[in-house]
């Protein structure tokens, strides 16, 4: 019985104790749980900052809900919900305070501009926690909203199943229904995000700014990412093959391989490969012809524009506009014979004494001067030498001049250089004014001079011609005003105009080299304006104008048309008469100079004297009779050197040739001496001297240096030297005749001819010519000359003598013997 009573189950009843939560929500603020709608498993997030390890499992929450359904009433359930809301709000406040703390920390780090690597890891963790807490708050809020609709359902179901459902070891029907309701709510509204817990990484300053910024679109990229993006873009561009550009290539007559590659923007190696395909082996520095260059360019896909080499000078061609033309001063050239008073006339016109500095009163080179008259008008005069050696210089002067003044001495009349000057002026088509000088001398005849001019078709105005003839006296300054008026009248009739605008151009009057100043060039500007710093090309010389000096020695900065100036800066000495032009840059000037040098070289080769076949045989055998006189000529100005060369090359050179090793402007140098020593040459200096070192070297090497100040003395001496080098002329001089009357045979001597001197004299050892019936049968020398038995040196006319010939005994009675001597005479050119 007792046993039965003990094992009898007790009836389930409600206790008096009140249902309560064992843990407060304060301890749950460190951790929150939510339901994954799909897997129905718990996703747990822990905060490292709070250090709480509290975890609420899904089973505990469900059991708690079951007990709540059994024991709690509606008021108790509402109280729970309010507590949950407070917990959610408290969690949000904690997260907000943490974010504000991090913001302050970031601002402090930004202002201090210091490294923040220790804070960067915490910041990343805080950012993740913030995201997690936001998700948790959203889930809690949604659960609360759903639970507000649950109490009514709970009350109904509690009444139906409160008594029926067993509670021990079982879940109540209300708990099951609540679980289903929660599952529906989770399926419909709550989707728990999947959160990955990664290892924290170090943050940079830019990342902090990005986390704290509100506008995600305005975030700045890190420098490393920008750098990586740029490198990626570069690699992308490098991997893409650039599109080839095809050009129009300008090809001259001759072009270098490297220049052709540059013109096409191709690699030199590619150009060389194309040349090899064409069978041409060339490197980058070698030149090829136009046709080959065109084939290479065409094969590479480029178009070709062929130009001639002479096209480089096209930049020098320019036309002046009519509205730019202005009146300019006339350029007057003074010509005439030696010592007729050309320089004295210029002295009188510009009131200077130039003639005093000229050797012997003879002008040695061209001078250009500008004279300003009383009314302000100007005249430019060019003085040319009167010696015949300067005919080329006079012809150049006639080409650049507007008016020619022919100076004729009233007491001397028309001479050779006067006629030559008239011919130059006529050939140039330049108006002529005749100035009859020295009318102050007694016993002069002006009419005779005018009549001589008529012979050369120079007819004065008084005789119906168009030439103005003005009698003057340069020494007494008579009628100089009339001469100036005549010049200005002719200039006005010609309407001389030029444009002072644009690049300058003109003519080289003279050039020289001066120690300490370099190359000095006298030029005459014909158009445009020349300024300091302009780059000019004159012949094959070029350079930048460094300094300009006028005819009075004053430095100027610009020169207008008809103004003669002396400039410094050319790299070489140009020739008198060369045209000069201003170009844009030094490259243009260099290209033009190189082109002109090639032309001059080709011309020199084409006109070089060719040796005859006989001369070549003589040289090959070593028996050449042609002699050479090597010379080195140095002068003070280029025009004088040219005049000397022109005169020397006119000398006859049949038996001897004049060889000019070197000619130039400037003093005699050591290199000139070395060249003269190596070639056994004579150095000729015209108005220049040798330096101390050059003199020492000349004495040591025994080099002959000769100085001259007058050109015709130099020419005469060179002519004499050449004549002395010629072989002498051998001439026969007849001295007598002998008639053979008897033949004697003498033992050990041979035949002796008894003779009678019929004419002249006979000398021992003289040359003889044996004639028989007026035919020469022997020519030799006398071996013996005796009178009776004595040897004598000579026998005169009317005396008898005995004679014998060397190595010849075929003599007969009646033969005639001519006696003569061989005389040598010096040859002259």
Swiss-Prot record:
Per UniProt, residues of the tr-type G domain are: 327-497
InterPro entries found in the cross-reference section: EF-G-like_DII, EFTu-like_2, IF2_II, IF2_N, P-loop_NTPase, Small_GTP-bd, T_Tr_GTP-bd_dom, TF_IF2_bacterial-like
Q: Where is this region: G2?
A: 361-365
| Sequence segments annotated as region (G3) | 383-386
In the UniProt record, which is one GO cellular component term?
Answer: cytoplasm
Chain residue ranges for the region called G4: 437-440
Q: Where is it chiefly localized? A: cytoplasm
What Pfam families would the database entry show? Answer: EF-G_D2, GTP_EFTU, GTP_EFTU_D2, IF-2, IF2_N
One of the entry's Gene Ontology molecular-function terms is: GTP binding
Q: Where is the stretch described as G5?
A: 473-475
Keyword tags? Cytoplasm, GTP-binding, Initiation factor, Nucleotide-binding, Protein biosynthesis
Record's subcellular location = Cytoplasm
Q: Where along the chain is GTP bound?
A: 336-343, 383-387, 437-440
* Origin: domain of life: Bacteria
The family annotation for this protein states: Belongs to the TRAFAC class translation factor GTPase superfamily. Classic translation factor GTPase family. IF-2 subfamily.
Record function comment: One of the essential components for the initiation of protein synthesis. Protects formylmethionyl-tRNA from spontaneous hydrolysis and promotes its binding to the 30S ribosomal subunits. Also involved in the hydrolysis of GTP during the formation of the 70S ribosomal complex.
**Record-given protein name:** Translation initiation factor IF-2
